[in-house]
Amino acid sequence: MEKDLRSRGGKRLSRRDFVKTVGLGSLALSGISFNPLKAWGADGKKFIWGGPSEFQSMDPHAIYDVTSENLRLNLYDHLYRYLDNPPKIQPWLAESYTVSGNELKWTFKLRKGAKFHNGDEVTADAVKYSMERLLALGKGSSALFKPVVDPEGVKALARYTVELNITAPSAPSLPLLPPFCIVNPKVLEGKPGPFGSEWLSQNDAGSGAYVLEKYSPGGGWTAKRFKDHWMAWQGNPVDEIEFRTIHETAARVMALQKGDIAACDGYLPVDQLEKLEKDPNVTVYDQQSMRVMVIRMHNQRPPFNDVHVRRAISYAFDYDSFINQILKGRVVRNYGPIPNNLWGAPADLKGYTYDLKKAEEELKKASVKIDRPLNIHPMTGYAQTDDAALIVQAGLRQLGVKVNILRETWPTLSGKAKDKENSPDMWIHWVSTYYADPENWIGEMYSSARHGAWKASAWYKNPQVDDLLKRARTISSMEERKKLYEQASRIVVDDAADIWIYNTKWYGPHRKNVKGVRFCPIG
C-alpha cells in the first residue's frame, strides 16, 4: 500500500518506497500534512510503523516475503514497480523495454542519473551483477528467475542498456521484474561472504529513497532520507522512517492509539480492529485485496502423504465459524489457491466445507493411519493463526486425533519450510501478491520445481499439475493460460494439497494525521 511522498514537475508520483504495511503493499509519502505526534518525532519528520514479524536479513536477494518488502521498497530500486489498485506495472529504473519476436530477448533502457547511496551511478553493469548475484545465491526471489534466466544471458550492452535473454518464453516475464532489486557491486567488493552476503545481511547497498541507519534482527530498522534520489524530493518530505517489531498484538494496538507509532499491520483480530475504528485519532482503511490464508500440510510426510487424510482434515475445519463468527464476515471464503477475484480461479470451484461425517468417511478410506499427534504451527504475533489452529485442533479432536499447537515466529517457520525434513506438519500463513499473476499462487505453491522455497512447503508433487503449470508459464494467450490454471486448480483442490480459507480485504490502521494513503495489493 502506498502514500504519496513527493511530486515532480507538477504531477504527483506514487512512491512505493516508504512504508510497507500489513504485508499487502507499501507506503510512500508525498505532500503529507504533518501534525506532530510522538510517532512523527518532534518536528513531524519521522514515520514509525509497527509490525509483528522480525527482519531475518537486510540482503534483498536473500529474502522474499511480506515483511522484507518493507526494506526492499524503501532501501532499493527496481526496473519496474506496481502501483495502485488494481495494480499496474510502471517503469522505475528502466524507462522502456523492447522484446524480440520470439519473446526470448528483453532489452531495457535505464534512466540516466540514478545514484546509489554512495554516489555511484546506477548502470547496466549493476543490473547485470544484481541478476547474477541473485541467481548464484539461490535465495529470496531467485526461484522466480532460475527456471528461465541463464546468468550468461544477462548482458550490459551499453552504460544504460541491459539485455536479458531467457531460455523459454515466460508469460509473466515483465510482471516478475518488480521483486528484482538492484544492488551496488562496488560497495560489495571485498565484503565478507559470497557476493558480500554476510556484510549485506546487516547493511545497505541500494539506491532507494532511504538509506539504512540502524538494524536489529529482533527489533527492526531505521533509515534516513536519501536526498539525491532520482525522483526529486519536493514539498515536506519524511526525513526518517522506522520499522519496529512489536510481537504482541495488544502492544501494537496500544502503541498506535497512544501515538507511539503512526501505523501498524493489518493482521489484527476483529475486536482490535473494531476498537481502532472507534478511536477518533485512528483511521482504518479497507480495500479489496488478493491475499489468501492457507493452512499448509506436508504432503510427503505420513500421515499427510495419504490424500484421504488430507481430505479428512480439510472437512474437519469449521470455515463458517472462523469466517463469520471469529472474523465477523470481514473476509470472503476462498476455495482454492488462487484468489477468487483474479483470473485463473475457477468460478464454479466448490472446495471443502465443514462436514465431520465426510471427514470420518475419508479417514476410513485412508491406507495410512494417524498413529501420532499432529503438530500445527501458528505464527507469533498473528492472532488469527492462533484462532485457526484452535479450530483445527477442535475439529480433529472430534475424530479422535490429537493436535499439538506450537507457536513460532515467521522467520523460524519460513526457514524450516524450505527443507523437506524440517518443514512443519502443518503451519498457517497468508500468500500475498508479489506479482499479479496466478503463477504467484498456484505456480509457486504447487509446482514441484519450486520445492525448497517456503511458498512450496506443502511438498506437493503431481506430474499432471506440473505439466499444466509449465505450459501456463510458457504461452502468451491469457485465455489459454486461464484454462490451464483453472484445470490445475481443480486437481490441486481435489488432492487437498492444503486448506484454503479466505481471500481478504486490506484493513490498514493509521493515525488520523496520516494523509494520502494509496493502496496497492502487491507485496
Model-based region annotation:
Residues 50-101, 132, 205-207:
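N-terminal lobe/hinge region of extracytoplasmic solute-binding protein
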Residues 123-132, 159-165, 208-209, 237-240, ...:
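Alpha-helical secondary-structure segments
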Residues 198, 228-274, 402:
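Ligand-site clamp/hinge motif
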Residues 25-29, 34, 216, 220, ...:
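Detector for C-terminal structural segments
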Residues 109, 143-189, 214:
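Surface-exposed binding/hinge segments that line
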Residues 95-140, 157, 163-165, 255, ...:
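Aromatic- and charge-enriched surface segment that lines or borders ligand/interaction sites
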Residues 83-88, 178-236, 240, 248, ...:
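Gly/Pro-rich hinge or "lid" segments in bacterial periplasmic/extracellular proteins
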Residues 1-17:
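N-terminal secretory signal peptides
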